Amino acid sequence: MSRALDKAGRWIGWAFFADLANGLALTFGYMFSRPVTMQYPDKEKWLPYSRYRGHHFLKRDDEGEIKCVACELCARICPCDCIEVVPYEDEKGNRRPAKFEIDTARCLFCGLCEDACPADAIALGQQYEFSSFSSRDLVIGRDDLLAKPGKAMTGGGVVAARLNTERDVLVEASEPRGYNWWRNIRRK
């Protein structure tokens, strides 16, 4: 009986040693490979893909008027109830939002508001840096939503960290620089 236990104990010991050796080999393989950490925000910034859903913004029509007709469909379809719209009628009889606020602290950035809008007035942009120390600062009003930039048609790379200070958006470099970490992730 003890002889069988000794054989089983040796076999279990070798199995654990093999697992330990595999784990150490993987660790040493990553230790001597090139790092995948980006030096953010000082040296490099990430350009989101064109389908990325970041901050919200409101669109204007050709005459410079807000496209929103205050139908409140975006507020009704929102799963987290973070959109508040208060309508009014202007002097021409057009329905416009007197108050349009989005609480980005509660928002899921699902894009349902963008899909539900019949006037194509609300969209999700590509800005991903809007952190704050207070949740009250994350409630964005109508005027701020109108001032935000729209979507870029390119993206998905790493560029040098340069900002256009007038619009607070990234200026794309002539060619993306930096380490393309996504291409070099090891997959089994």
Swiss-Prot record:
- The yes or no answer to whether the keyword Plastid is present is no
Query: Which compartments does it reside in?
Result: Cell inner membrane
Matching entries from HAMAP family are given as: NDH1_NuoI (MF_01351)
Which protein family is named in the record?
Answer: Belongs to the complex I 23 kDa subunit family.
Q: From the Swiss-Prot or TrEMBL record, what is one GO molecular function term? A: quinone binding
Chain's role: NDH-1 shuttles electrons from NADH, via FMN and iron-sulfur (Fe-S) centers, to quinones in the respiratory chain. The immediate electron acceptor for the enzyme in this species is believed to be ubiquinone. Couples the redox reaction to proton translocation (for every two electrons transferred, four hydrogen ions are translocated across the cytoplasmic membrane), and thus conserves the redox energy in a proton gradient.
Describe how the cofactor binds. Binds 2 [4Fe-4S] clusters per subunit.
Q: Which domain of life is it from?
A: Bacteria
Name of the featured protein: NADH-quinone oxidoreductase subunit I 2
Reactions catalysed, as given in the entry = a quinone + NADH + 5 H(+)(in) = a quinol + NAD(+) + 4 H(+)(out)
* Residue positions binding [4Fe-4S] cluster 2: C78, C107, C110, C113
Q: Spell out the Gene3D superfamilies in the cross-references.
A: 3.30.70.3270
Chief location of this protein within or outside the cell: membrane
Keyword list (alphabetical) reads: 4Fe-4S, Cell inner membrane, Cell membrane, Iron, Iron-sulfur, Membrane, Metal-binding, NAD, Plasmid, Quinone, Repeat, Translocase, Ubiquinone
Species of the source: Rhizobium meliloti (strain 1021)
What membrane topology was assigned to this protein in its record? Peripheral membrane protein
Q: What is its EC number?
A: 7.1.1.-
Q: Is Oxidoreductase one of the keywords?
A: no
According to the entry, every stretch annotated as the 4Fe-4S ferredoxin-type domain falls at 56-88, 98-127
Record: residues binding [4Fe-4S] cluster 1: C68, C71, C74, C117
**InterPro entries found in the cross-reference section:** 4Fe4S_Fe-S-bd, 4Fe4S_Fe_S_CS, NADH_quinone_OxRdtase_chainI
Q: Which cofactors, by name?
A: [4Fe-4S] cluster
Q: How does it assemble?
A: NDH-1 is composed of 14 different subunits. Subunits NuoA, H, J, K, L, M, N constitute the membrane sector of the complex.
